């Protein structure tokens, strides 16, 4: 599959505040602009053009506290995960479908990096679609704030389930195991309730 090395990226050397976040949201949601415009507009931001280096993306060789791979499947491989570890990353949260290879996930776990798998951390889109279907079937019109409040509750519950399930099954802090086991149990319970098992 294609990798995010095909895409440029920005590195923030100063914190992002509400004003800058609003500017980015307007750029992406309304103006449909490119992130380079953000780097051109604000100080403390470095833009790096795409580099066609297969299987190695310099983005991940950056000193960051949190990494959010959100572009595509297999975005971070084991070598790139090690670059993040070497740069003392604290947490990685997937924002796409399996952007981290199994080797990358293993590297994060082996080095004590908090890792949120996409099936949990990237569930907001699916949850919002479910809320939209509920809203439509009820012939209701929720405000953006109401949808956001409902989504927040769903995401808090997903975190709680993954966290508590990992602890219950002897793997505290392993959100991959917690999310997988919690998901399996939910499906198994539904199958039992339907008399399928």
Residue ranges and their predicted role:
Residues 3, 69-71, 94-95, 116:
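Generic beta-strand/beta-sheet core signal
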């Amino acid at each position: 599959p294609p990798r995010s090395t095909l895409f440029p990226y920005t590195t923030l050397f100063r914190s992002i505040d509400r004003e800058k976040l609003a500017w980015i949201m307007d750029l992406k949601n309304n103006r449909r602009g490119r992130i380079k415009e953000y780097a051109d507009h604000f100080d403390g931001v470095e833009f790096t053009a795409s580099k066609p280096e297969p299987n190695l993306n310099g983005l991940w060789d950056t000193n960051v506290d949190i990494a959010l791979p959100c572009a595509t499947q297999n975005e971070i491989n084991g070598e790139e995960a090690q670059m993040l570890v070497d740069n003392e990353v604290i947490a990685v949260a997937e924002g796409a479908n399996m952007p981290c290879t199994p080797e990358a996930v293993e590297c994060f776990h082996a080095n004590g990096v908090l890792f949120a798998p996409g099936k949990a951390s990237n569930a907001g889109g699916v949850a919002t679609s479910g809320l939209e279907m509920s809203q439509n079937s009820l012939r209701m019109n929720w405000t953006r704030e109401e949808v956001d409040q409902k989504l927040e509750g769903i995401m808090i519950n997903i975190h709680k389930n993954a966290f508590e399930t990992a602890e219950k099954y002897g793997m505290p802090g392993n959100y991959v195991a917690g999310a997988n086991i919690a998901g399996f149990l939910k499906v198994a319970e539904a199958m039992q309730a339907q008399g399928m098992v």
